[in-house]
Amino acid sequence: SSIRSFIVINLRRAGYDVIEAETGEEALDKLKENPDTRVALLDIMLPGIDGFEVCRRIRATNTKIGIIMLTARSQEMDKVTGLMTGADDYVTKPFSPAELTARVDALFRRAGGEEIPQTGEIRQDPFLLNTRNRTLEKNGQRIKLTQVEYSIMKVFMENPGKALSREEILDMVWGRDYFGELKIVDVNIRRLRLKIEDNVQNPTYITTVWGYGYKWGF
């Protein structure tokens, strides 16, 4: 399609190796053939299985790859659904080449694990965050996190008991050059709570600071 060609041309101009797929099934096959792929761009309206289902299937076996969903500006629920199925970010159509490239750049760096801290681990019972291999355990059990979820956990565990605004979290996790909306913070934290909280309806680890942001409850 024309939008796919537009994306491929601009990402190749930015220096990326790009693999194309016309359908959801083809995308999954090509990811199996190219397991070191760092970032996937998924249009929701794919022929065959849609972008949501492709995202779910990718996340079932791969938490490292960065996933960006392409959505229509008017479809707010599509953005939330995409993030809740495992996407790290979304870009609304129409978008500029600069915006898309900036989003891909940010996820590409994170998916490559470039930001590796000097210290080895952060322990706040029942959690253990290993900053060398970028993993999280709760009561000794590994919790599968995406790269964005890991980055959010790291921000919280480095700032125990401190109220962090949505803007601060956005800057620390997505970077100051991020073009998107604050909503992405809320949805990713909602997804993270599903993985770490004992009772999602009454969270005790990531608590909401109403009208401001969130706090790691230690």
What are these regions (language model features)?
Residues A21-E22, L46-I49, M77:
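Hydrophobic residue at a beta-alpha junction
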Residues R56, A60-R123:
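Basic, amphipathic DNA-recognition helix from helix-turn-helix-like DNA-binding domains
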Residues E20-V39:
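Acidic, metal-coordinating helix/loop segments flanking the phosphotransfer/catalytic sites
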Residues S5-R13:
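Charged docking surfaces used in two-component/phosphorelay signaling
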Residues E114-E115, T119-E121, K144, I189, ...:
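DNA-binding patch around the recognition helix
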Residues I44-M45, R73:
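The short loop immediately C-terminal to the conserved phospho-acceptor aspartate in CheY-like receiver
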